[in-house]
C-alpha cells in the first residue's frame, strides 16, 4: 500500500470500516474475475469523493477499475455503509473524548406555507 492510500485510509479508519462493509457476492459470468480487495476499493472511493476527481479519471494506481469502484460505491450506498461508518467514527471519537458537544450547532428551518399556495 502506498503513502497516498495510507493517508486516505489510515489503519485506524480501516479497522472501524472493515467490519461494516457488506459481504461481496461474485457476479456470475464465464471465467469470472479475480476478487478486488475491499480496502483498495474503499480507498479509491475515498479518493474520488475527497478529491473531486471524476469517476472516469480514477488513477489506475489504486488497482481498481472505474466500473468496479462505482459499482461497489452504489452497492455500499444502498446498504447504508456511509451512514453506519459516520456513526462508528462519531462513536469512536466520542469514546476518546475528542468531540466537544458544547460547541455543536443544530440548525433547522421551518416556514409555514400560506393556505392555498405551494
Located regions from the model:
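Short alpha-helical elements
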Residues: 1-118
Amino acid at each position: 500500500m502506498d503513502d497516498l492510500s495510507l493517508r486516505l485510509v489510515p489503519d485506524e479508519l480501516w479497522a472501524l470500516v472493515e467490519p461494516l462493509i457488506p459481504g461481496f457476492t461474485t457476479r456470475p459470468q464465464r471465467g469470472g474475475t479475480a476478487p478486488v480487495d475491499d480496502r483498495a476499493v474503499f480507498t479509491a472511493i475515498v479518493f474520488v469523493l475527497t478529491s473531486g476527481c471524476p469517476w472516469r479519471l480514477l488513477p489506475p494506481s489504486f488497482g481498481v477499475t472505474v466500473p468496479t469502484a462505482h459499482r461497489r460505491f452504489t452497492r455500499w450506498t444502498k446498504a447504508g455503509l456511509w451512514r453506519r461508518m459516520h456513526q462508528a467514527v462519531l462513536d469512536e471519537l466520542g469514546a476518546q473524548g475528542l468531540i466537544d458537544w458544547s460547541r455543536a450547532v443544530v440548525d433547522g428551518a421551518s416556514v409555514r406555507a400560506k393556505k392555498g399556495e405551494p
